């Protein structure tokens, strides 16, 4: 169904221009983090362009890093005059200057997937906006999009483009490891890829198809009556009725509560901010 309102971006290989102040913010943040040896990797629109040549308007700069590195980065940037905010300690902080911002992302909002040091170690050297930096590897970029399947935003096309653009030359063992217990989300993305690009289904290696489909068939043939409802991990709003009215499991709250490492604002920074208030 077509909804009137703000036009959605149309895919293209054309690189989108940034506002001059926006570009300077991104460059300054990248340089400061690099100069202070904060381990991170660029993701989002810049990583997608790097790996697929698909251009997209960059409303922000996505930086992936561990929770510990995020706290260090916030400390460094706040001391340099940037306005910093921990929006959700489970996964998101923001760095602002004027009307523009940078996102620090430490995992998925549902806490099903968390950025670890291995994500950063596997990042690839590149140049973003003239600044030498590192960009998320395609395997981690793909994994970061598996749960972006909400009604208002869906990254299935990005996953399909990653597989298509790389011709499937990916570390599939790594992708399977990243998916872990959520392998069915990966399988659903691969089935969509096969539907979109039927002539390129071989880009996903046959052993990967076999492993995932066999696991699915085993689950179907031997269903677990105690298996828990997982809808809230997919879209907490669309499946709110299941949790709030029908009494089904709220795995989202459980996952978020069990998140081992949240973004913690440095204590001395909190004191500085309170003293300035």
Predicted region positions:
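Catalytic cores of NTP-dependent nucleotidyl/adenyl transfer enzymes across multiple folds
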Residues: 2-9, 114-277
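Short, hinge-like loop/turn segments at secondary-structure boundaries
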Residues: 58-60, 82, 103-104, 121, ...
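Anion (oxyanion) recognition and catalysis
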Residues: 34, 78, 127
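Short Asp/Glu-rich motifs
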Residues: 52-53, 96, 182
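Short, flexible loop segments at the rims of nucleotide/cofactor-binding pockets, characterized by
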Residues: 17-19, 62, 113
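Helical scaffold of the NTase/Pol beta-like nucleotidyltransferase catalytic core
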Residues: 1-42
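Active-site nucleotide-donor binding segment shared across nucleotidyl transfer reactions
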Residues: 27-61, 65-74, 135-137, 242-277
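Conserved catalytic core of two-metal-ion nucleotidyltransferases
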Residues: 79-118
């Amino acid at each position: 169904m077509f909804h009137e309102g703000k036009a959605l971006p149309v895919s293209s290989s054309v690189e989108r221009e940034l506002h001059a102040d926006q570009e300077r913010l991104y460059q300054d943040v990248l340089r400061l983090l690099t100069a202070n040896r904060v381990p991170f990797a660029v993701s989002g629109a810049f990583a997608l362009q790097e790996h697929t040549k698909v251009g997209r308007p960059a409303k922000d700069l996505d930086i992936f890093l561990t929770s510990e590195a995020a706290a260090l980065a916030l400390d460094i940037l706040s001391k340099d005059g940037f306005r910093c905010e921990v929006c959700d300690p489970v996964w998101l902080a923001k760095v602002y200057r004027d009307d523009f911002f940078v996102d620090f992302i430490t995992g998925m909002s549902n806490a099903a997937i968390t950025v670890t040091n291995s994500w950063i170690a596997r990042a690839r050297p590149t140049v973003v906006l003239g600044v030498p930096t590192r960009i998320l590897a395609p395997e981690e970029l793909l994994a970061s999009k598996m749960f972006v399947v909400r009604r208002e935003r869906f990254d299935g096309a990005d996953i399909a483009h990653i597989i298509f653009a790389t011709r499937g030359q990916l570390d599939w063992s790594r992708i399977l490891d990243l998916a872990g217990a959520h392998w069915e989300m990966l399988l659903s993305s691969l089935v969509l890829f096969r539907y979109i690009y039927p002539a390129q289904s071989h880009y996903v290696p046959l052993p990967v198809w076999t492993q995932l489909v066999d696991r699915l068939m085993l689950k179907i043939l031997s269903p677990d009556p105690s298996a828990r409802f997982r809808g809230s991990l997919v879209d907490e709003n669309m499946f709110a009725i299941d949790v709030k009215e029908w009494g089904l499991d709220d795995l989202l709250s459980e996952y978020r509560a069990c998140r081992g490492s949240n973004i913690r604002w440095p204590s001395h920074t909190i004191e500085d901010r309170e003293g300035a208030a």
